[in-house]
Swiss-Prot record:
Pfam families given in the database record: AAA_5 (PF07728)
Name of protein: von Willebrand factor A domain-containing protein 8
PROSITE patterns xref list: VWFA
Gene: vwa8
Cellular component aspect of the GO annotation: cytoplasm; mitochondrion
Intracellular or extracellular location(s): Mitochondrion
Record-listed ATP binding positions: 439-446
Organism: Danio rerio
Source lineage: Eukaryota, Metazoa, Chordata, Craniata, Vertebrata
């Protein structure tokens, strides 16, 4: 088992080795030179001789005996070691240099030292690291009293003095450093920097024969001693990490494999140590260790077991024989923390094999019971008593120099059983070795280490490690003395070693292993050689040396030899290695040998609660409970997303949350969690996962408090007290006023909330971290915050090249002395200022992590040897300590993590030591208010548009549709521009922001569509005004009179009795008011038309719109299948909907189709409407705010009527009479109801709650409320008209009687009273108010003042009745006649042929706009003179209707087409009953109408002329008045200059036009003389002629033939490309259908992949270069004149032996089952899946090295249908189309059935076997899981069955809420439901961006 060697030697060598092992002890001496050798020391006259076996070596007396290693020999030398020593002696006698190679551990060094001790040789030891340079080996310059001179370094010293040079860690040194030694090794020659030349002893002695020593000295030749040898120690590199040996270097060494000691020797050694432990356990332990070091375990990539640490483990076991071996193994080899699943199973298997799994049965120590100091002896010791299974065992451990503190006496440390046990275990390890604590960030490593130190009376020396730390930073740094001499300063680590402190190496996982290697000798042997030649020895060796040489301490110190204090110990703190990642495997075999490891497990729930409540006694208990529930549910999850969230909720973060809740108990826990996780900037998956976890733990997410407490967010400074919102703090009075920032800041609610939050945390003493997109005002908020608090600030901006040095001190050279200037950080710490660190994410996280020590412990070591300490008392006694000012705080600003900022993940690395605040763009209202302050003169409409458009763009950026997050900064810049140059158009100014994207086609499309949607006419020209064509209106003629009868006898007859009773109200019932977002599009984005805006109501396709009405700025739409009401604001962005199908059942015994009218009530009943169902005469009153529905029952006698016979109003031949509602005066809260052919009117006063019923002597056809007290009635059958006058107030007069007057109509020709008059026509619409006098005069073409009404009927465009209804004299009727009357029937229907309907449509669609003097009707295209509207060769557009606008002011007629709806209800006949056209219409404001078509599309139109003119002006302003004049550059000169060349020119007396000619004044288009439109003239001079000007458009235009040529060229290339891939044009267009649909997602994915690739290729600093930028760390070396003191950026080659970057592995599992094909017609699911597959193929094209993907299908035929193989991905469009065709064909012809579950299981299983960086499975399925009897939790189990494989499922939504239910049961962030199949590509993009790319 031990014969495995680490080189692939020849088979023969292996065999020989094995046989030697087996036969070694039996063979005779000469057989193998391997018999038992002995080491003898012989004293002879010629000096002492050492004999090993038969080889002897004569000792020489060392010149410097203190440099000879002492105390290294083992008591009993194992045979193996003796053989190694004998071999080294052979090589030494031959004068060869040796290389001891072998696995990591101290054995090789120990053998070398033993040999040197044996042969009494002086040693020069160098630990090579990646920072070693040539100067460390040869010569270093130092400055003494102003001159630089050279000091020999180890190699030169060893060569000249005849010492042995021990080089350890050859694989660590950078390439090309060691070849410096090549010549010294080979020929023992070397040229030195100071001009001397080392020459081998042999040659030197030859020269001496010819020359004198003086001559050689003059030639600067130095003799190399013949005793000089090199012993190199190194690791074999292909197996371990490091640089391989240079072949020329390798050839100069003789190698010897130093493997672990043989089993037998090792066993004997362990038996001696662990006398109390049963022999069997010792041998099992050793067998276990040896197994893990074997070649086989290396192939499993398990790191080697640190065999060399077994003795220390046995020391512990010897004291505590009852301990569990398995737990000890964990300390030596923490396999659970560092290995993946396979590795863990392998290790546990071996443990079982050797019966070592006794972790559960054997006890572990439970607590430290007592600690007391032990007196006597030189070293401080403490007796520690541990409690283990109720036995108390006491043992002695080293202790510190401070007084010992008994356990459990610390006020700040809350003890929990876990921690007590951990401390007890650490005591055991402390007995033998240094400790390393492994635990996640924020779990209390530092706290435990400090508690441990205090218990043992240690002083702590924290050493913060960072990534680009060098070996010098760890051990010794150079500095200059005041006189300019260079000197070395020991690092804190070294001083701590001498003083016996406890060093905390914080962040050992960050530092480079090549640097850490310099500590291995300190950790293993407690010895250290420093750069200036100082040596530190282990205490016992130092004592031995002192006694042997009889020297005093002082003498030894003069020879720079110092002891290491026996109490000195190191505790390393590290985060666990990331299992499976390639980067962070810091726990390698080398480090395993250095420490004993203790992992800190996350606390159990009860213990953590105890800690939280112990630390913060007054925190609300319920909050803690909720937090704990959430945190532990996240930690227990095996979902990587959940675990990453859990890491944000570390114990430290929980303590912070609790501290805050204890101060502000009214805050919600959800808010705190969102803040801690920074949920605003999480990828969408993680955010949904977090929200789901919060919901599962029933943590309520309270609504945004901003809406509730608007009035609270103000800030005031009063009597030295600052109040923000409801938090107050005293204002600071600083010494330095000038450093307090003062900034232009406009307050808004949202920023005040952030500041209030910041103030809360600030008062709690937290350091703050503000994270947000660019330009959201982080800097402004902070400056404003500090301004309000009156705190001075120091400002530090980080960038890519920030180093730890620049963060703390800036070195500079002055007069040859290095001066350190304090950075803002140090100043802020000293003075108590606030340090603002900007752009923190730009600096590498390894740099910024030094802030951690500063925040956490308030300690930090500066480059010049000073240190910051938190405790002022501690600083008092120490000269170089800077006490941290109590007022010092840090505020860090960073951009949001992740794409597109590409910063470093500052939040991920350091987020939990700051209190985090997400800063977002202000909410629309807040942003609007703020912009208003920046641009007070910019019109509100423009600001609203900007705010809305940018709001939408930001939402898109959050979803990942666009990559750049547009911020407030951009909008503010636009507004500032508009404020200063108001004439520039908005459309032009926004280009300042969007021109960045003008070359990216997809991006440009998205932007333009978003801007157009909000009415920013980017791209429109001032000429694109497309208003409808105007036609002349026929002349206005007086056509007749209306006379109101006054006859006395008829008057009595026509009195109408009225009665009044209360309304019977049933209800209310409360229905849900649902709010849907409306995608409101401004229509005037590219051209100016009458249409203002349009949007779609979210209604079902089969629903039918049957009425629309408006009130102020609200629009109400009623639909009748099912009955629902939609309400929206004219400018709003949401639609409220109440569905009333519970109240109107679909049928009452038959096919009953409801038909609804709606009336909007006025003040004080705003937002309330009355719905009237015309058949059942149901009247409902709805409150749209509360959702209350009440039924108003009008007549008492109607209720007991028998149910009517069933009918449906669109089938019966005889139209069933319906009930009608007149709503002209609904805004006054009264309505009138009547029944067709009935003879009574019901007047409902909604406010009073009364009904007045009026009985009439006639049967009604129609009622028009022409005034509040005068109503026009039309009699049915005869169409005769009557005027009903009523007293103004019902019931005010006793009579309460209404009078009815008949109206006679007369034609113009005959005289009065002649009843032969005109035939009676029923009017369609009569206005309820009169035209203003100007409008009336304009309409009739004569000045006139009179009451009037507009009346519309089918024969005329409009009629004006002058004098009606107030004057009793005959009223004149003026008409604008039509040539053809409007017919009332629709054309035969396209689908259903000519289903004739009887009677007119229900909706007349005629509106009178009195202010605009217009009548607007909606007409079907058949009724429109299209030939006159459109030119001959233009085909009229397909339209739903035309709006006919009759303008009585301009006497013009316009026809405006209303675009067709996208979707049409199948119930065409029913629709034809509603309206003659496909729209219904209502007036909107005073100059416009709103139309709603049958597809539910709402359009707003502006028809009034003055409205249109005003809008056109605004629109032109928005485009900007680029009037085509060339821009002139004018330089105004002072008059003193000679202006001769431009002249005024001659004045022509005749003033004839002159064009050009450089002669006449007042010309046009010339040069040099004054005139218009020319160039170079002195000024403009207009002589009144037409200006000849080339139009700007013409100048800019590209000639047509050029355009044509370009188009042909593109087409040619396209065809050529198709030909190459043999694709037909039809195929190309088919493929384009799929690829075009996902082009945008593909684009954005590729952008992200590219940038990731770029980020991965980011260059690193290469140090020790001969050119580049000066490296701060090397300034002193620069002073002394060294060459390689520069650093430059370069590609860092990956270290050899570091694992290869493997590609990520993706499998897409597409559903190609029959149902996909079957339901494709419904929602296009198959096509969407094909698009998704197309997207994967296109996005990952040419990234095959990073993503290996394949695509398989699952259907009823099986679960593994191959579509794309990962080794044969489609290369071009043809191959991709083939894949898509296969999918389509398969789903068309496959069996039914569902294999989603099996397919997913199979894919996950198969992928897990493959080698990859990460594994992803994405399942697309329309699985109706319940139908196939699959329970969702089974599916959930499959998705998470293998933690290595990230599986996601996208369900194509199916019936009802099934998909949502499914999503609730499946793990969060793992399953998506695409109810709308268009979302599939977006979801896929989300998955890609948030997971694959998080770690790429």
């Amino acid at each position: 088992m031990h014969s495995r060697i680490l080189f692939k030697g020849t088979a023969a060598a292996v065999a020989a080795r094995r046989i030697r092992h087996i036969l070694g002890p039996l063979m005779s001496k000469e057989g193998w030179n391997c018999s038992a050798h002995e080491v003898k020391l012989l004293n002879t006259s010629s000096g002492d001789t050492v004999k090993i076996g038969e080889i002897s070596y004569v000792l020489k007396t060392p010149k410097n005996p203190e440099l000879v290693p002492v105390n290294h020999m083992m008591e009993a030398l194992p045979q193996m070691v003796t053989q190694h020593l004998r071999w080294i002696m052979q090589k030494d006698l031959l004068g060869q240099d040796v290389f001891l190679i072998g696995p990591p551990g101290p054995l090789r060094r120990s053998i070398a030292m033993q040999y040197l001790e044996l042969t009494k040789r002086e040693v020069e030891y160098v630990a090579l690291s990646r920072d070693t340079t040539e100067t460390d080996l040869k010569q270093r310059r130092e400055i003494r009293s102003g001159t630089a001179f050279y000091i020999d370094q180890c190699a030169v010293r060893a060569a000249t003095e005849g010492r042995i040079l021990v080089l350890e860690g050859l694989e660590k040194a950078e390439r090309n450093v060691l070849p410096v030694l090549n010549n010294l090794l080979e020929n023992r020659e070397m040229q030195l920097e100071d001009g001397r030349f080392l020459m081998s002893a042999h040659r030197y002695d030859k020269l001496l024969e010819e020359h004198t020593k003086e001559e050689l000295d003059a030639w600067k030749i130095v003799r190399v001693s013949e005793d000089f040898r090199v012993i190199a120690l190194g690791l074999p590199v292909p197996r371990y990490k490091g640089n391989p040996l240079d072949p020329p270097l390798r050839s100069r060494f003789q190698a010897r494999d130093i493997y672990y000691l043989p089993f037998k020797d090792q066993l004997e050694h362990l038996y001696r140590i662990g006398a109390n432990v049963s022999a069997e356990r010792v041998s099992q332990l050793l067998s276990f260790a040896t197994t893990l070091c074997s070649q086989e375990s290396a192939s499993l990539s398990l790191p080697d077991f640190p065999v060399d640490n077994l003795p220390s483990a046995l020391t512990v076991l010897n004291l505590f024989p009852m301990l569990s071996v398995q737990q000890l193994v964990q300390r030596l080899y923490p396999y659970e923390a560092m290995l993946g699943k396979e590795g863990r199973t392998a290790v546990e298997g071996v443990l079982n094999r050797f019966e070592l799994t006794d972790g559960s049965t054997k006890p572990s120590p439970t607590a430290v019971v007592n600690i007391e100091p032990v007196n006597g002896g030189q070293a401080e010791q403490a007796a520690v008593t541990l409690n283990i299974t109720n036995q108390k065992i006491t043992f002695q451990v080293p202790s510190g120099t401070r007084p010992i503190r008994p356990p459990n006496s610390s006020p700040t440390f809350i003890n929990t059983p876990t921690h007590e046990r951990l401390l007890a275990e650490m005591m055991q390890s402390h007995l033998v070795k240094d400790i390393c604590l492994i635990g996640a960030k924020g779990c209390g490593k530092s706290v435990i280490a400090r508690e441990f130190a205090e218990m043992l009376g240690y002083s702590i020396e924290p050493v913060m490690l960072y990534q680009d730390m060098t070996a010098r930073d760890l051990l010794q740094q150079r500095y200059t003395l005041p006189n300019g001499d260079t000197a070395w300063r020991a690092s804190p680590l070294v001083t701590a070693a001498q003083e016996g402190k406890l060093v905390l190496l914080d962040g050992i996982h960050r530092v480079n292993l090549g640097t850490l290697a310099v500590l291995s000798r300190l950790l293993h042997d407690r010895e250290l050689d420093l750069y200036d030649g100082t040596r530190l020895l282990r205490f016992d060796r130092y004592q031995a040396l002192k006694e042997e040489l009889q020297l005093t301490d002082q003498q030894l110190q003069d020879r720079s030899i110092f002891p290491i204090h026996p109490s000195f110990r190191i505790i390393a703190l590290a985060e666990p290695p990331v299992i499976g990642s390639t980067t962070q495997q810091w726990l390698n075999p080398e480090i395993l040998t250095m420490f004993l490891f203790h992992t800190i497990k996350p606390l159990a729930k009860a213990e953590e609660t105890a800690v939280l409540q112990g630390m913060i006694p007054n925190v609300p208990g319920e909050a803690v409970e909720q937090l704990q529930h959430l945190t532990h549910s996240l930690r227990k999850s095996n979902d990587p997303t959940a675990l990453s969230l859990a890491s944000s909720l570390s114990t430290r973060q929980l303590l912070r949350i609790c501290r805050r809740l204890s101060q502000y108990p009214q805050e919600s826990v959800a808010h705190a969690v969102h803040k801690a996780c920074l949920s605003r900037f999480l990828p969408s998956l993680a955010r949904s996962s977090l929200e789901k976890s919060l919901a599962n733990c029933s943590i309520e997410d309270h609504p945004d408090p901003a809406s509730e407490q608007k009035q609270l967010y103000t800030c005031t400074v009063k009597d030295g007290l600052l109040t923000i919102g409801n938090v107050s703090a005293p204002v600071y009075s600083p010494d330095e006023k000038m450093k307090v920032p003062d900034v232009l800041f406009y307050e808004n609610v949202q920023h005040m909330m952030v500041m209030q939050d910041m103030l809360k945390d600030f008062l709690l003493g937290e350091h703050l971290l503000l994270v947000g997109n660019q330009g959201v005002g982080k800097n402004k908020i902070v400056d404003r915050f500090l301004h309000l608090m009156n705190r001075p600030r120091e400002y530090l901006q980080l960038h890519r090249d920030t180093t730890v040095q620049t963060l703390t001190l800036q070195p500079s050279v002055r007069d040859g002395i290095i001066i350190y200037e304090d950075s803002p950080l140090v100043k802020a710490v000293k003075m108590g200022h606030i340090l603002v660190i900007d752009e923190a994410d730009k600096a590498p996280t390894n740099v910024t992590c030094i802030l951690k020590a500063l925040v956490e412990s308030g300690e930090m070591i500066l480059a010049d040897g000073r240190r910051i300490v938190s405790d002022a008392l501690e600083a008092a006694g120490r000269p170089n300590a800077i006490p941290m000012h109590p007022d010092f705080r840090m505020i860090v600003l960073a951009n949001r993590p992740g794409f597109p900022f590409l910063g470093n993940d500052f939040f991920g690395a350091l987020g939990d030591i700051f209190s985090c605040h997400a800063v977002d763009n202000p909410k629309p209202q807040a942003e609007f208010a703020m912009l208003k302050q920046y641009g007070p003169d910019v019109p509100d409409a423009v600001l609203q548009k900007l705010v809305a458009a940018f709001g939408e763009l930001r939402a898109m950026a959050d979803q990942g549709t666009i990559t750049y997050p547009y911020s407030t900064r951009e909008v503010v810049n636009i507004v500032k521009h508009l404020q200063k140059f108001p004439d520039e158009g908005l459309a032009n100014v926004v280009r300042n922001v969007f021109d960045f994207d003008s070359y990216n086609k997809d991006m440009r499309e998205v932007l333009i569509s978003a801007l157009h949607k909000h009415g920013i006419p980017i791209g429109a020209k001032p000429t694109s005004v497309h208003l409808a064509k105007e036609l002349p209106l026929p002349d206005c003629k007086m056509t007749g009179y209306w006379t109101i009868s006054q006859g006395g006898n008829t008057r009595r007859k026509l009195l109408c009795p009225t009665e009044t009773h209360r309304i019977d109200i049933k209800g209310p019932v409360f229905l849900r008011v649902q709010s849907y977002p409306s995608k409101r599009h401004e229509s005037r984005s590219l051209s100016f038309t009458e249409e203002q805006a349009h949007w779609q109501i979210p209604m079902n396709e089969v629903n039918i719109v049957c009425d629309v009405t408006t009130a102020k700025d609200s629009i109400y739409v009623a639909t009748c299948n099912p009955v629902s009401l939609y309400a929206m604001k004219e400018k709003g962005d949401s639609v409220q909907c109440i569905e009333l199908y519970d109240i109107f059942p679909r049928t009452i015994s038959g096919v009953w189709q409801p038909f609804v009218s709606v009336a909007a009530l006025g003040n004080p009943l705003q937002d309330q409407v009355v719905l009237h169902e015309e058949q059942g005469n149901t009247v409902l009153h709805l409150d749209l705010v509360t959702g209350a529905v009440r039924r108003l029952i009008l007549s008492q006698d109607k209720q007991d009527e028998a149910p009517r016979k069933t009918s449906n109003w669109w089938n019966s031949k005889e139209s069933q009479p319906g009930y009608k509602m007149c709503k002209e005066f609904a805004h006054k809260n009264w309505l009138l109801f009547y029944k067709e052919n009935g003879n009574q009117l019901d007047v409902v006063d909604v406010l009073e709650g009364q009904v007045h019923t009026i009985h009439l002597p006639i049967n009604l056809k129609a009622v028009f409320l022409v005034a509040e007290d005068r109503w026009l009635l039309v009699e049915s059958k005869t169409d005769r008209k009557f005027l009903l006058t009523k007293p103004m107030h019902m019931g005010a007069e006793e009579t309460g009687v209404c009078q009815l007057h008949a109206i006679s109509e007369d034609a113009v020709s005959s005289g009065f009273g002649n009843n032969s008059g005109m035939e009676a026509v029923s009017p369609q619409e009569v206005s309820s108010d009169q035209l203003s006098n100007e409008n009336l005069s304009a309409a009739l073409g004569q000045k006139i003042v009179s009451p009037n009404r507009i009346l519309c009927d089918t024969n005329t465009y409009a009629n004006v009745i002058v004098g009606f209804p107030d004057l009793m004299s005959p009223n004149e009727l003026y008409s604008f006649r039509r040539s053809l009357p409007i017919t009332e029937s629709r054309r035969p229907d396209m689908f259903f042929g000519s289903s004739k309907r009887t009677g007119p449509a229900k909706r007349v669609n005629c509106v009178c706009l009195l202010d605009a003097n217009q009548v607007v009707r909606a007409l079907p295209p058949t009724q429109v003179p299209l030939a006159e509207v459109y030119p001959k060769d233009v085909t009229p557009p397909m339209s739903a209707a035309y709006l006919e606008v009759t303008d009585l002011n301009s006497k013009r007629l316009k026809y405006i087409p209303v675009p067709r709806s996208n979707s049409m209800s199948p119930y065409t006949v029913w629709i034809s009953k509603v309206s003659d056209t496909d729209v219904v219409m209502a007036p909107l404001g005073s100059g416009g109408v709103v139309t709603v078509d049958m597809g539910g599309y709402v359009r707003l139109w502006e028809t009034g002329l003055d409205h249109l003119q005003r809008s056109l002006l605004e629109w032109r302003n928005m485009i900007g008045s680029e009037d085509g004049r060339p821009v002139q550059i004018t330089i105004e000169r002072d008059s003193g200059l000679d202006v001769s060349s431009p002249k005024h020119g001659k004045i022509d007396a005749k003033n004839a036009p002159h064009v050009g000619g450089n002669q006449w004044a007042g010309g046009t288009g010339g040069r040099d003389t004054a005139g218009l439109g020319g160039k170079g003239g002195p000024y403009r001079l207009d002589a009144g002629h037409k200006v000849y000007q080339i139009s700007q458009a013409e100048k800019d235009a590209v000639p047509d033939e050029v355009k044509r040529a370009a188009r042909d060229m593109a087409e040619q290339a396209f065809k050529q490309r198709l030909k190459e891939i043999e694709m037909s044009e039809y195929d190309a267009s088919t493929y384009d259908r799929f690829s075009g649909a996902v082009r945008r997602q593909v684009q954005s994915l590729r952008i992200i992949l590219d940038s990731l690739q770029a980020k991965g290729k980011e260059r690193q600093w290469l140090r020790n270069q001969a050119l580049g930028e000066l490296d701060d760390a090397k300034i002193i070396d620069g002073l002394t004149g060294e060459k390689s003191i520069y650093k430059r950026r370069g590609e860092l080659e990956p270290e050899l032996g570091s694992p290869q970057q493997k590609p990520k592995r993706l499998r897409v599992l597409a559903d190609v089952s029959g149902s996909m094909y079957r339901f494709n017609g419904v929602d296009g699911r198959l096509e969407r899946s094909m698009e998704a597959v197309c997207m994967v193929m296109e996005a990952l094209e040419s990234y095959e090295h990073k993503f290996k993907y394949d695509i398989t299908g699952h259907s009823g035929d099986g679960f593994d249908i191959e579509l794309v193989r990962c080794d044969k991905v489609p290369k071009n469009n043809k191959e991709r189309l083939k894949v898509l065709k296969t999918m389509h064909a398969h789903s068309q012809f496959c069996m039914s059935g569902d294999y989603t579950l099996e397919g997913t299981e199979h894919a996950i299983r198969e992928l897990a076997h493959e080698e990859a960086d990460e594994h992803f499975v994405i399942v697309l399925s329309d699985a109706n899981l319940e139908r196939y009897g699959i329970s969702p939790d089974r599916f959930a189990r499959v998705l998470t069955s293998n933690p290595q494989v990230n599986a996601f499922a996208i369900f194509i939504g199916s019936l009802g809420d099934q998909a949502d239910r499914l999503q609730k049961t499946l793990p969060a962030g793992r399953s998506f439901v695409a109810m709308d199949t268009k979302e599939i590509p977006q979801i896929l993009q989300q998955i890609f961006t948030s997971t694959m790319l998080s770690s790429a």
